[in-house]
Regions:
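Internal helix-turn-beta structural module
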Residues: 197-253
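Glycine-rich anion/phosphate-binding loop at the beta-strand->alpha-helix junction
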Residues: 117-212
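Glycine-rich, N-terminal phosphate-binding loop and its surrounding beta-alpha-beta segment
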Residues: 1-32
């Protein structure tokens, strides 16, 4: 039976976006949506609005029921010019920082950006623990490829890497082969049972200046996007878990 969920939202004000009805914003889907469909909804970003991610979070909850022993964690390692010194996935930061000692500094930074109509991006780290072995396909449906696709579908996500990430560009083969941890829990596109580590890069919101002051525009989406990231990982891992289980169903004699 299909699962239906109704979410009522009264916390919206469409008139905040009236000034965008006749203009395109760089870095948004305004122009490309109109080019594709011949029309667009300018209110709050229309189909490309971050509000659509609520359905992903709801779906992620149901996916997590299939994976009761898998632990999904995420946190902000970089926000604008601020780099967290620690990588603590048990951080108590209300902003989602991996190092809660930077909370006050980040709050002050975001408030100053909000007042100036400025914005910033950053980096998020993800850890998936207790992922079953053998998930993913060897060629076209590699686990890292499907995770990358699902995570890059989140608005403003501009890059995804696994394990040592960008460090692979300068690591020698002899350095890489010493430890399978370098690959972040995925080898040859298939999970090896170790913790999966993912790095994501998010761009700054493109609406700045006076436009950012008039509508409902966040100076940074990172604190809000963490549940969405974890949900997309849950959905992808659940898909591959069910797929792998289908391979192991015993054929009748």
């Amino acid at each position: 039976t299909p699962i239906a969920v109704i979410v009522k939202n009264s916390n919206q004000k469409s008139s905040d976006y009236d000034q965008l009805k006749s203009e395109y914003r760089a870095g948004h889907a305004d122009k490309t949506t109109e080019l594709k469909y011949g029309h667009r909804d300018h209110r709050g970003g229309g189909r490309a609005s971050g509000r659509e991610t609520l359905s992903r979070v709801i779906g992620g909850y149901f996916a997590s029921l299939i994976l009761p022993n898998v632990i999904f964690s995420s946190g902000i390692s970089k926000l604008g010019p601020i780099h967290c010194n620690k990588k603590n996935f048990n951080s108590t930061s209300p902003l989602g920082l991996l190092d809660e000692s930077f909370d006050t500094k980040v709050e002050e930074l975001l408030l100053s950006y909000k007042e100036k109509g400025e914005s910033c991006g950053g980096e998020v780290l993800v850890k998936i623990q207790n992922c079953p072995q053998g998930l993913g396909e060897p060629v076209f449906d590699k686990l890292k490829a499907d995770l990358g696709k699902s995570l890059l579908s989140i608005g403003s996500c501009m890059g995804v890497s696994f394990g040592r990430g960008q460090d692979f560009a300068h690591l020698l083969g002899s350095d890489i082969s010493k430890d399978s941890d370098n690959f972040g829990g995925i080898e040859g596109g298939i999970s090896n049972g170790e913790d999966i580590f993912i790095q994501l890069v998010f761009k700054a919101p493109s609406t700045v200046g006076e436009k950012a002051k008039e509508g409902r525009h966040d100076p940074c989406i990172l604190p809000r996007v963490l549940p969405v990231i974890e949900s997309m990982c849950k959905l992808t891992i659940a898909d591959h878990f069910l797929r792998q289980n289908a391979y192991q169903i015993k054929k009748p004699d």
